[in-house]
């Protein structure tokens, strides 16, 4: 008896894609060419199950996404960024915004940065030149920053709009993403403005610091002030008229002259020995000039001194103050070895005990060693 025929084998079941295969296909997307990606995207958009897929994605999003209804639409402005903007505007680096500020904007455009609108000194000219360089660098970098921010924002917006065709992306979410991008770029903007402010402050401290200006007197101004100081060493307190004259000769202000004399007196008291050589130079120069002008016929190389037995003061011509140095230098007897000049008489302003007058009675206005106060 013949055996029954065997049934035909059933066709193999279609192979189901597991998770690893799906992930492999997803990872392969990055290796696709642009034409392949466009073809796959077009096929997906035309697929009959695409609306169902989109509906499922919307349901999943409603269950998992965090509601954004309670989030503020706009964050408050950064206080530190506002302070930096105000500082850059005050220094003339930022351009004032064209809003309803009227005269304030006009004044900001006409005033010279740094609070020196009418000062044409070398320091301020150099300051304005370097400030202009800082301003150019700042605006160049700010323009690059703004361009990069615009390009990146446009790219992300286009990407989200394209993805919204496949997954639910609302316009509100796109706005939130743009705001997050601007927040990231704001840190770069703040760093740029902070660096610019530090550069301006460093420039101001180097070129507009009043203490530095006092140290940078010209050689002519220093010569004028030193000559007056050592020629009036027994009373180095110039009057207001003398200060005006010294300021005019040295190209300084009266305040600078007053400060210089105050500092000079302090330094002289602290280290008198150090200034003896300098005093000899200036007093010798002044004595020669005064002798040539006010004492015609006097050819002596050394100054004569009154004898200890003299009963009257050293004679003063009508020039008065012009011969004050001669009297000061002649107030002490020269050493036995012979010397033209003695050390300067010590007045009360120098902190030493005044020497009694030997050439005239106490209280005589012509006394050489009488104590003098300001």
From Swiss-Prot:
Got a GO cellular component term for this one? Answer: chromatin
SMART domains attached to this UniProt entry: HOX (SM00389)
Q: Which keywords does the record carry?
A: Activator, DNA-binding, Homeobox, Nucleus, Transcription, Transcription regulation
The secretion signal range is none
Q: Which residues bind DNA?
A: 210-272
Spans annotated as PBC-B = 103-209
Q: Region labeled PBC-A — which residues?
A: 21-100
Domain PBC, first and last residues per copy: 14-209
The family classification in the record reads:
Belongs to the TALE/PBX homeobox family.
The protein's name: Pre-B-cell leukemia transcription factor 4
Instruction: List the lineage, top down.
Output: Eukaryota, Metazoa, Chordata, Craniata, Vertebrata
Whichever gene encodes this chain, its name is PBX4
